[in-house]
Each structure stands twice: as C-alpha cells, then as structure tokens.
C-alpha cells in the first residue's frame, strides 16, 4: 500500500475537527480552530496525493464514484432537526455545552457511518487500485469477488466489504 490507510485518514480528520470544535467552545475562536484543522487535513492529503501520483499505476481502466445525493438530503434533514433540538434545549437554560453535544450526536453518528464506512471512490488501474484518493493497493493486496451482479472488494485493514453494482 502507498499512501495512508483510508479509515485512519478519515478518523484522524474527524478527531482534528472535534478537538478544534471543543477548543473553540472554551476559547471562542472558532475561525482559528476551523482553519487549523483544515490546514492539518490539507497537509496530510497533499502527502498522500504526492505518494500516490509518484507511484507507477499504469493505465486507468475504470472508475467508480461514490453515490451521495440521498445521504446529503438525509444529513440536511438531520441538521435541521439538530438546530431545532438545540434551540429547544437552549431555551430551557440547559448548559450550552450539553445542548451542543446532544443536538449534534445523531448527525455525528450518521456522518461517521457514511464518511468512514461509506462506499468510497475507487479507480482501477493496470497495476492496482486507488482507494478513496488516499491509498494505492496492488492487486495482490485485494480480495475481489463477483457475486450476483455485484463486485465485492475486501481490502486489508478496512472494516467491511465494499459492494458495487456492475
């Protein structure tokens, strides 16, 4: 594998954002914390991009992009519900930190499931596969099966099988 493990990359990005949000609650400087998290994410992503682009992958054979419009609609509805819950809890003079955490718990769980374990973008090359733009795997590192019109891909250190309709 060249690059970084996609799951660890995404989890580290979410942890950086979570820490910056917690720091912004105490220091009231949300913009600085937000920019710092995206600078750290950008440096890590640039490192992965350079590692993958310097690898001899061969010719691009096929690309599978992640479906996302249904998930985005669902997340938008959850964000509206989250704001509503936050306003209800804040109006009853609960602690603002507790209302912040409770109102965004559901949204965070859905984001975790879709962002971390959702179907990633995969590019098939002659010599291997680029997985979610942050890791390149040789064909020997993959377990690919075809079953009932689905392409099932199992990648080492990825928690679930990835299924795509052919």
UniProtKB/Swiss-Prot annotation:
It comes from the Archaea. This is Uncharacterized protein MJ1249.1. Its main location: membrane. To M.jannaschii MJ0795.1 and MJ0785.1. It is a multi-pass membrane protein. Keywords: Cell membrane, Membrane, Transmembrane, Transmembrane helix. The chain crosses the membrane at residues 7-27, 30-50, 69-89, 92-112. One of its GO terms (cellular component) is plasma membrane. The keyword Zinc-finger does not apply. It is found in: Cell membrane.
């Amino acid at each position: 594998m060249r690059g970084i493990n996609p799951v660890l990359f995404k989890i580290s990005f979410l942890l950086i954002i979570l820490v910056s949000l917690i720091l912004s609650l105490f220091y009231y400087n949300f913009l600085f914390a937000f920019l710092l998290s995206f600078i750290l994410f950008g440096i890590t992503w640039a490192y992965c991009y350079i590692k993958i682009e310097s690898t001899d992958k061969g010719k691009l054979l096929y690309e599978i992009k992640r479906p996302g419009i249904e998930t985005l609609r669902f997340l938008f509805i959850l964000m509206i519900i989250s704001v509503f819950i936050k306003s209800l809890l804040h109006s009853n003079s609960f602690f603002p930190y507790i209302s912040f955490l409770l109102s965004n718990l559901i949204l965070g769980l859905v984001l975790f499931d879709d962002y971390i374990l959702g179907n990633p973008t995969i590019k098939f090359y002659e010599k291997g596969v680029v997985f979610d733009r942050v890791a390149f795997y040789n064909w020997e590192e993959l377990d690919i099966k075809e079953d009932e019109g689905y392409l099932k891909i199992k990648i080492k250190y990825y928690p679930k099988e990835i299924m795509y309709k052919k």
